[in-house]
Amino acid sequence: IPQWFFQQSIPGTFTYHSLLTDIGIVQETPLREDLPETLRKLDSFLPYDLSHITNISKEIHKLKCMLIICDISPMGIVVARKAGIPSVLIENFTWDWVYENYVSTDFYAGKFVDYLRQIYNCVDYHIQTEPVCYYQNVDLSTAPISREVRTTSQQIRQKLSIPDGVKVVMITMGGIPEKYQFLEQLAYKRDIYFIVPGGSQTMRLIDNLVLLPRHSDYFHPDLINTCDAVIGKLGYS
């Protein structure tokens, strides 16, 4: 997760440390995975290097951290146990569940499924947020989590030159760069405005198209709040 995401989201002070915590799925595009490359990276990353985990746990002690919160990634659970502090897992899917659904293909990830599942089972406090992909017996189940809106939809419409009364649709690929080949066709839907984060390197307003860079001056939850519908990728389906 890039540093600017936290700068946009957290009002207080924080220290940002860049660290690879999981491989996930290597993607060629938002809609196409690279499974062979994913396997190569998993083979070099798992199981975790114990010396690496030890070094991170020592740094955790130096920083006087009292809790590790893990957003899907299981590495924090291992580090927390090594450091002797509690861990919290927040997820609506886990990587063992994702990899397990590929095992019947040429994606030979069975050994990673078992390894990661054992780690997830060791977490001190487990939270699942809707929409949940695989329900488990957890400590807390909750509604979807989101950042609070900061600017009204009316103000966003005015800033983006979107007329009152028209429908607005967002097209998003979850922050992964994509070349949209159909933007010209959307211009024919003149009664609908389309907001496309990542649709341009700079902000561009073209007829009914609002093309924004991936990291724009607009707070993403405000953009979503302005829309009547969102079209996006369905995760690792």
Predicted regions and their residues:
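Conserved nucleotide-sugar donor-interacting segment of glycosyltransferase catalytic cores
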Residues: 51, 55-117
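Active-site regions of enzymes building and remodeling cell-envelope glycoconjugates
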Residues: 10-22, 85-87, 138-148, 189-195, ...
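Donor-nucleotide binding loops and adjacent catalytic segments primarily
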Residues: 153-229
